[in-house]
Structure formats: C-alpha cells, structure tokens
Amino acid sequence: MLVYQDLLTGDELLSDSYPYKEIENGMLWEVEGKWVTKGVVEVDIGANASAEGGEDEGVDDTAVKVVDIVDVFRLQEQPAFDKKQFLGFVKRYIKLLTPKLDAEKQELFKKHIEGATKYLLCKLKDLQFFVGESMHDDGSLVFAYYKDGAADPTFLYFAYALKEIKC
C-alpha cells in the first residue's frame, strides 16, 4: 500500500486506495470522495421482530455520515479563504515547497503553479479547505468541492507536495 504524506509536515493526506486523476499539467490531483455512514452496527439474529411484536428496544444508533477521505486521514476543515488570503497562502507555499523539490521538479513547479492557482481561484467560492491532522500552518491545503449535480465531494491535492511512502 502507498501512502502520500505532506512533504512539508509529514501528515498522511491520501493513499493509493483512492485513485486520482492528474489535472492542470500534473500540478493537481483530483480524487473522488464518498459520504459513508460510520458507527452503524447491524445485527441479524434471525428473528422476525414484527412477528414477535418487538420494536427497536431503545438501541442508541450513533451512526454519523462522514466523508471517507476526511475521516480516514483525519483532515481538519479550515475557514474559507478570500482571494487575498488565498494568494497570500500560495506565495508563502511556493517559498516553502520549492526548496524541498529536486531541480527538475522545481522547474516544472514554477512553470505550472500559476495555471493551477488560476484553476483554484475560479473555484474559490465553492471550495472547502482542509489541512492534515497536525493542523500545521505551513502545511499543504487539501481542497474539496462538489461537481455539478454530484452528491459526493471531489478533492484537489497539490501533487508536488505529496511524498510517496510504502507501507
């Protein structure tokens, strides 16, 4: 199994259990999340409750709906950014991430980050913002939004900020 960690913080953000599609010249990974129900326990004892007059006997079903990626990787939602805040984040992020990349990736990153930033700016009002479990200020952001008519969110990751780890 492969796990993808944030290159800046070491937080686990994704695994190969979630297929991704590269967009914006490979700068962003697009990953489909799913709403799942967590905490549901179904017990089938083979009895016919309606025939025996039994109803739910006060079992406290603490089931909650969560997005799989958010739950599994313990992503923490952050307040939304306005355009000025987002551009400030991107500038700081470029300064932090660039030295961590090898020379070839640095060139590609510098060449394509503007296109990825414009892509995200176009969706800014629809984005939810997440950080890794450590909630470190200098970490990568993970973005989520809903495609037209979709019931499940789509996540966007900065591809160059992910470090592949074999488990």
Curated annotation (Swiss-Prot):
Query: InterPro entries, per this entry?
Result: Mss4-like_sf, Mss4/transl-control_tumour, TCTP, Translation_control_tumour_CS, Translational_control_tumour_p
PROSITE patterns annotated for this entry?
A: TCTP_1, TCTP_2, TCTP_3
The family database entries (Gene3D superfamilies) matched by this protein are listed as: Metal Binding Protein, Guanine Nucleotide Exchange Factor, Chain A (2.170.150.10)
Where mainly found? cytoplasm
Has UniProt tagged this entry with the keyword Calcium? Answer: yes
Q: Which UniProt keywords apply?
A: Calcium, Cytoplasm
Kindly indicate where the leader peptide sits in this chain.
none
Where located? Cytoplasm
Q: Which domain of life is it from?
A: Eukaryota
Ranges where the TCTP domain occurs? 1-167
GO cellular component, as recorded = cytoplasm
Give the GO molecular function terms: calcium ion binding
Known role: Involved in calcium binding and microtubule stabilization.
The family classification in the record reads:
Belongs to the TCTP family.
This protein's name:
Translationally-controlled tumor protein homolog
Q: What gene does the UniProt entry assign to this protein?
A: TCTP
